[in-house]
Structures are given as structure tokens and as C-alpha cells.
């Protein structure tokens, strides 16, 4: 009913209403309505996340570069790289002819994170009683403020997916690395911060799971609606940058 009313208003004002427009209208309504939530209340999601932060026993201690396990500093270039040649490398760059920058023409030199083939940043989407929900996780990273931030279903570099670290393949990776997956809602390469990363981009994805498919969800994952994600963005250092990037498509 609401979608049809908005559609009529747009058409009366000369807008071209196509399938993409209808999808955008549905997404807009999805992002502003709380009564559609079918699983967890917003308060429950906030309390769940805060509890996960309290339960996290990860500690982070700053150490010297030479004390890093399995990371090497080149004696010739000073570049820092992993012994597997995966993950990333710290290189130096010289930037010149920077007329449009604050420093003027002289340019500058700086270290950059390079040789990172990128990875997959993916959100699983599943409809419960017809309402889209997104599977997110409370993920700990050593550089996070508060240790944990709300992250996508899958946040994995190519090295992670190839198990270069010797560990397990990330959970739910099978939903995102299937080339013939017909349930892909969105899949595009998007660049990282070019001031810190050298020629890096990640494959941002939203993949829909069939409503009748049962998933085994660990307790550090939770289903949330788009409305809830938008509300959680009002809380400082709660929603990580990768989720913010993916949902910008919606």
C-alpha cells in the first residue's frame, strides 16, 4: 500500500519508475520501520553486543616490528612482509607533482599498505516472514576502539580464504565464493582508503539465503534489520566501517 502510494506520487511528478525504483522504495521503508522486526529488538541487539565486548578476553600489546612472529623486515628495502607472502606488505612511496594538495608541488614520502589482493566483505541476507534481516557479527580486531565492532557476516582477505595463516576457512565463506551463486543481491569491487592502502579494493557483497534454509549461527553472530543498523550508527564506535560501506548500496 505504502509502496504504491509513493510510486504514484513519483509518477505524478514526472519520475521514471522502474524495477530499481521500486526496490529503492522498499529499502527506504525497510530502513525507517521498526515494527517489522521479527527476531530481536533494538535494545536486545545493543545489550547483546555490549555483553560480547565485556566477555572478550583479547588483549593487545604494542611490540617492536622486529619482534613480530613470521613477519620479516627486508634488509635492502625495509619493507615489511609476511613469510607466506600473503596478507599485505608495508612499502614506501614518493608522491610528486601534488599541486592540488596542501603541501604544494613538492610532494612527500610515506609508508603504505600494499600488495594486498583484497578480499570479500559480505553480508548474508535472509527474509523472516518476508522481512529482510542481515547476519552480522561482533568481531574483535586489534585496532578497534572497544576491541569489538559490528562487522559483516564475512570479512576475509584472500589470504584468509586460502588459509595462509594455517587456520580454518572463515565461517559462511561458501556463500560468497561460489561464482554461480544465483542469490547475489549486490557484488562490486570498492576501493579502500587511498591515503593508506596502495591500489587496494575489496569485493563488497550481499547474498540472499532462501527463507527455508536453516543456518547454524554461533552466538557471536546475530540477525538485524536495516532499520536497526541505521539506528546503531548513532552509537559511537559500534558499527564497523565495512558494514557501513556495504549498506551504502541499499
Sequence positions of predicted segments:
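N-terminal domain-onset segments
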Residues: 1-99, 234-250
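Extended, Lys/Arg-enriched charged tracts that mediate electrostatic binding to polyanionic substrates
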Residues: 60-118, 122, 173-190
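Generic structural hydrophobic/aromatic packing signal, biased to beta-strands
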Residues: 90, 134-136, 154, 205-208
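Core of folded catalytic or high-affinity ligand/protein-binding domains
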Residues: 95-155
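An exposed acidic His-Trp-rich patch
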Residues: 134-195
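Elongated scaffolding segments in large macromolecular assemblies
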Residues: 187-250
Amino acid at each position: 500500500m505504502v509502496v504504491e502510494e509513493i510510486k504514484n506520487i513519483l509518477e505524478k511528478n514526472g519520475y521514471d519508475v522502474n524495477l530499481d525504483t521500486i526496490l529503492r522504495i522498499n529499502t527506504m521503508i525497510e530502513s525507517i520501520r521498526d515494527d517489522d522486526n521479527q527476531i530481536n529488538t533494538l535494545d536486545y541487539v545493543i545489550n547483546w553486543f555490549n555483553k560480547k565486548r565485556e566477555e572478550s578476553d583479547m588483549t593487545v600489546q604494542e611490540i617492536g616490528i622486529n619482534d613480530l612472529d613470521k613477519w620479516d623486515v627486508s634488509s635492502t628495502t625495509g619493507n615489511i612482509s609476511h613469510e607466506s607472502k600473503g596478507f599485505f606488505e608495508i612499502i614506501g612511496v614518493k608522491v610528486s607533482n601534488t599541486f592540488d594538495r596542501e603541501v604544494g608541488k613538492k610532494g612527500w614520502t610515506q609508508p603504505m599498505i600494499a600488495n594486498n589482493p583484497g578480499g570479500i566483505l559480505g553480508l548474508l541476507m535472509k527474509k523472516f516472514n518476508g522481512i529482510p534481516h542481515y547476519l552480522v557479527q561482533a568481531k574483535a580486531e586489534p585496532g578497534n576502539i572497544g576491541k569489538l565492532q559490528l562487522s559483516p557476516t564475512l570479512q576475509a582477505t584472500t589470504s584468509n580464504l586460502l588459509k595462509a595463516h594455517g587456520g580454518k576457512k572463515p565461517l559462511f565463506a561458501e556463500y560468497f565464493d561460489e561464482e554461480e551463486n544465483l542469490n547475489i543481491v549486490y557484488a562490486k569491487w570498492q576501493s579502500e582508503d587511498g591515503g593508506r592502502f596502495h591500489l587496494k579494493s575489496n569485493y563488497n557483497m550481499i547474498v540472499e539465503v532462501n527463507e527455508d534454509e536453516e543456518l547454524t549461527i554461533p552466538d557471536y553472530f546475530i540477525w538485524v534489520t536495516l532499520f536497526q543498523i541505521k539506528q546503531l550508527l548513532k552509537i559511537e564506535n559500534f558499527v564497523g566501517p565495512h558494514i557501513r560501506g556495504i549498506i551504502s548500496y541499499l
